[in-house]
């Protein structure tokens, strides 16, 4: 993490950083391990929770955690017949999308109560303008996708910039450094379900640096929501 450390050392002001882990509801043991790693370093974590996959036992654990909690689609199911995977893509009409979003929101409200933030992360970080319009109509306050996605301009968006699962240590170092130089905020995305022990160790190395550097201001997503 030498490039990142140098970039943080050179930052003229603190850089906001947030952490979003997707697919809560799958691979509970790995999820709880990642939550524990963040707790060890005293860093905030936001979880994108799959409504149809959340069981009562995990819901209780999440309510008792310090993690931010928000909605991750409905069932994380691909509805596209061709092209890239998408749960809320052009293959579905606006009414069908709205039904799933509302059903998922109601399910999470039932089991998570006031711990649920009115934010939405679409599975695979993809959705349509119809999705965004539905989110506005249903009272959501924030949409989170990847930073390369063109904003819809309908509600605030807080994108992630770095996908820990897809980057080599060298790529993560260089790209994180570049986003720090741009001034932030910087969103770091995790997928606990694919994290092996080596990945957890690499995550801990990154968290240790970010937790102790004076130029890092670690935030929950709700703190960055307008």
Residue ranges and their predicted role:
Residues 5, 31, 35, 59-62, ...:
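Generic structural signal for well-ordered alpha-helices
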Residues 2-12, 142-143, 192-226:
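C-terminal domain-boundary segment and adjacent tail
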Residues 80-91:
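Surface-exposed, active-site-proximal loop segments in enzymatic domains
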Residues 92-166, 195-202:
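Catalytic domains of cell-wall/extracellular-matrix polysaccharide-remodeling enzymes
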Residues 158-185, 189-194, 198:
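A conserved mid-domain beta-alpha-beta active-site/ligand-binding segment of alpha/beta enzyme cores
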Residues 1-68, 117, 188:
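Active-site beta->alpha N-cap acidic-glycine motif
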Residues 23-29, 48-59, 121-130, 164-170, ...:
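Acidic-and-aromatic substrate-binding clefts and catalytic sites of carbohydrate-active enzymes
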Residues 24, 73-77:
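Short glycine-enriched loops at secondary-structure junctions
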